[in-house]
Amino acid sequence: MLEQDAQVTDAELADAVAAEEAAMEELLVRLVETETTLGNEEPGQIVMREAFADAGLEPRDLPLDTDAIRGSIYSSPFSWDVSGKANVVADLPTAGSTGRSLVLNGHVDVVGPASEQLWRTPPFRAVRDGDWIYGRGAGDMKAGLAAIVGAVRGLRRLGLSPLAPVQLQSVVEEECTGNGALQCVLSERRRDAAIVTEPFPAAITLAQVGVLWFHVDIAGSPAHVGEAGEGVNAIEAAYRLLSGLHALEAELNDDPPSPFDTFEHPINLNVGVVRGGDWPSTVAAECSLSCRVALYPGTPVVELQQRVEETVAAAASTHPYLSAHPPHVRYDGFACEGTTVSADEPLVQTLGGAWERLTGTAPEHAATTATTDARAFIQHGIPAVCIGPHAESIHGVDERVLWPSVVQTAQVLALFIRDWCGLAG
């Protein structure tokens, strides 16, 4: 095999990837129909091991190492057991060492379907309707994993190998901590760039917010409902705290920095889970709120944690019972800062060029009010961006992905690998 660039055109690469469309769709269907919510990721990783092997690669596991993760300043706290969880990675055979190395990353885990009764089709059954494929995780982000595999299958079809290391990663825990991608960064050799195929169509993400999950435990005083005035309802007391937290949210949105000043409301507080009480005829003795709030790049997580704690304490001080029995704030899940990448990065320029040549239109440079695993690479000095298929209703009802955009993403990745790494055959 010659250590030189193969003379392969954009059209030849795109056609080779398109020839793998059936295999990509089959993989996406299998992934969607394999439930991979938190704690149930392994069945999806079995599918990804098989997909990597079917593409001619040798998959290997990267188990989550609790001590290594918790020892990193970039980890998010977690209270659950991660033993037995593993990322799955595969390295492309190389034809030389003259190019730039690369990671192609996607996450296999998904959020739950919420109320299945609201879905037009069962959430864990992949249903194609015209150019759309429905199902939980179809867009976020199992289609991105299918695109990664499709790009590699296209290269293998042409008998081409990169002139630098290229690693494919299927990671866990993107939806709750980001510790899966962090484990890859901690365990594997440094790469020159990373692309995460999150569903950001026709846009390269250069900035993303950080995210903080926090939980507020509120103690009330139980009583028989016939003597409700003798007790303190913890659920009702929670309203006082929520009012204060939404006031904090408004403050955080007062003067957003660029590029988040293009959003009407870039910092979103979400009360995602409320648990409280144990009996309809008993004044609720306890209530817990599980919340998510965002933070701008440059804001330390500890600074936002302090503001949350001060806000909860201030709101509690105005309540006759909570002022003497203050709520407790704890952290479990996301605790990550925002990140940015320069538009002048060679990664951004090269990826934009590949997209424009394939589609005829230059991709936008975008910011997102969510967080992604690109963060783990950026925090370790590895330029990383997101670009991927067109998806709708992610985390919502009737999530779906536009199938032609999945094929297009795979084609762009193949062109990018040629431009970034070089190819030989």
Feature map (PLM): residue ranges:
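Hydrophobic/aromatic beta-strand patches that form the interior of the parallel beta-sheet core
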Residues: 60, 102-104, 193-195, 214, ...
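Short beta-strand segments
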Residues: 105-106, 170, 195-198, 217-219, ...
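Short, conserved micro-motifs enriched in small and acidic residues
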Residues: 131-146, 159, 232-236, 400-407
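Metal-dependent amide/peptide-bond hydrolase catalytic core
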Residues: 1-12, 54, 206, 213-425
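Acidic/His- and Gly-rich active-site-bordering loop/insert found
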Residues: 2-133, 157, 162
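Acidic/histidine-rich catalytic neighborhood of metal-dependent amide-processing enzymes
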Residues: 133, 139-213, 421-425
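Active-site catalytic microenvironments for nucleophilic, acid-base chemistry
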Residues: 34, 151-158, 244, 248, ...
